């Protein structure tokens, strides 16, 4: 947790930005996996954590800007609870730790909100992403689940995004702790990736590192695969073989729930094959092209376009594409081998604030998302500002199904040599990913440990 003053100041800034109304924050509850008592690991809602800091289930918070009061609603433990959990601080004790002096039982929440609505006051809430939140909002506010997101308050959303998107020095230090744990996870994967090893063994090893500190764990489900052309491959069903490329996309979340997110691509053999080295080096050029665009005021869309153009240039050099690389990038033809975005915001969520809406988080007000394949997957396009924390992760993927579909449809025939692609359909895919902070005059990589990137660094890491 942060200091009490941190939470008080965050709420004061939010109140000033929003101005009026009743702000409703639903904390998360326990959720059963296959029956009610067998629960998924609890994860508190990130906005609740940011403003109220209390990391346990069964809480709802209200900021009544009209009345000038803040309340946490929740129930005290009964003796039946204490038998299973042990003695815990009371709700009022916990509330005082974050600067809130008033608590009420959960049963009082519906009447509190009902009275405000009868007075004609506005209840401001965030888009729900859990089924139980949708049921609660229907009960509390009478809004059907199918239209709740339409009633979510844009003023509140934009105010929260503006606060959470700019990281303080204290937040950056905590994020770097998570990034360092993430780096150790990846260094272990370089050591373990050998012929005969199962993907699941490496996934288990990185989980152990992520979980080895109190309160720590994974920031998201690990991707550990030799089928890198499948962008989100969580199956862990393969055994590593000579000549494979092993891809790890994994990150740690620390006790404060800030995240790291890294990706690594490495040879299962001692070295990449010449063809693999060629694509890996092309990938590094695209990565550096994106990084060269990272500075205050420059839209992140330009970083994506720079990475796409570098990949297009490499595809032309290989004879897989033809024409002007810039035209290939702007047309969208590059997306045959790079169908996703270059990065995303990161913080308390690995895709930071994605529940609030990508349009608000990743795009400037009034800026429209592209509908073009490839560009439509940009989670981040807005002009960069000091304090932004985000990932950079261009990749190159040879996806047989996508190649076959585009060839059959005759898409971008003026740019793509489909016959040449036939020999590459068994290549797979690769990417690397690092986490960055925008500074006053540029950017810097987050973390005190170095993740291997160059061929020399990769080969050294595999032989430690």
Task: Show which residues each predicted segment covers.
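Active-site neighborhoods and metal-handling regions in enzymes and metal-associated proteins
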Residues: 1-464
């Amino acid at each position: 947790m942060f200091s009490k003053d941190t939470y008080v100041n965050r709420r004061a800034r939010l109140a000033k930005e929003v101005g009026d109304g009743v702000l409703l924050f639903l904390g998360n509850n326990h959720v059963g996996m296959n029956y009610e008592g067998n629960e998924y690991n609890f994860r508190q809602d990130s906005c609740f954590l940011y403003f109220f800091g209390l990391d346990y289930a069964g809480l709802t918070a209200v900021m009544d800007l009209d009345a000038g009061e803040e309340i946490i609603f929740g129930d005290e433990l009964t003796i039946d609870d204490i038998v299973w959990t042990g003695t815990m601080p009371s709700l009022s004790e916990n509330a005082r730790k974050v600067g809130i002096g008033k608590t009420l039982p959960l049963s009082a929440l519906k009447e509190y909100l009902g009275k405000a609505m009868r007075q004609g006051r506005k209840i401001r809430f965030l888009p729900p992403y859990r089924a139980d939140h949708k049921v609660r909002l229907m009960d509390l506010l009478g809004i059907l689940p199918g239209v709740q997101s339409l009633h979510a308050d844009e003023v509140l959303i934009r105010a929260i995004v503006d606060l959470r998107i700019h990281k303080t020095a204290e937040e950056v230090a905590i994020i770097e702790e998570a990034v360092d744990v993430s780096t150790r996870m990846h260094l272990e994967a370089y050591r373990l990736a050998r012929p005969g090893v199962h993907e699941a063994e490496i996934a288990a090893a990185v989980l152990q590192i992520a979980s080895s500190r109190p309160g720590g764990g994974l920031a998201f489900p690990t991707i550990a695969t030799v089928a890198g052309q499948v962008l989100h491959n969580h199956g862990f069903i393969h055994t590593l073989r000579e000549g494979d490329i092993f891809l790890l996309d994994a990150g740690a979340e620390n006790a404060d729930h800030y995240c790291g997110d890294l990706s690594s691509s490495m040879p299962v053999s001692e070295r990449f094959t010449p063809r693999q080295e060629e694509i890996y080096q092309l990938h590094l050029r695209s990565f550096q092209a994106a990084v060269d665009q990272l500075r205050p005021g420059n839209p992140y869309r330009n970083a994506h376009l720079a990475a796409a153009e570098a990949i297009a240039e490499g595809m032309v050099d290989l004879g897989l594409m033809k024409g002007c690389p810039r035209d290939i990038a702007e047309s969208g033809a590059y997306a045959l081998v790079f169908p996703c975005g270059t990065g995303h915001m990161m913080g308390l969520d690995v895709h930071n604030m994605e529940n609030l809406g990508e349009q608000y988080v990743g795009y400037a007000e009034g800026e429209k998302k592209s509908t073009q394949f490839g560009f439509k997957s940009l989670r981040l396009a807005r002009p960069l500002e000091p304090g932004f924390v985000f990932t950079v992760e261009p990749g190159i993927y040879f996806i047989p199904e996508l190649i076959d579909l585009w060839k059959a449809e005759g898409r971008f025939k003026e740019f793509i040599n489909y016959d040449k692609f036939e020999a590459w359909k068994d290549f797979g895919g690769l990417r690397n990913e690092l986490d960055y902070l925008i500074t006053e005059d540029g950017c810097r990589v987050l973390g005190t440990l170095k993740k291997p990137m160059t061929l020399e660094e990769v080969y050294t890491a595999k032989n430690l």
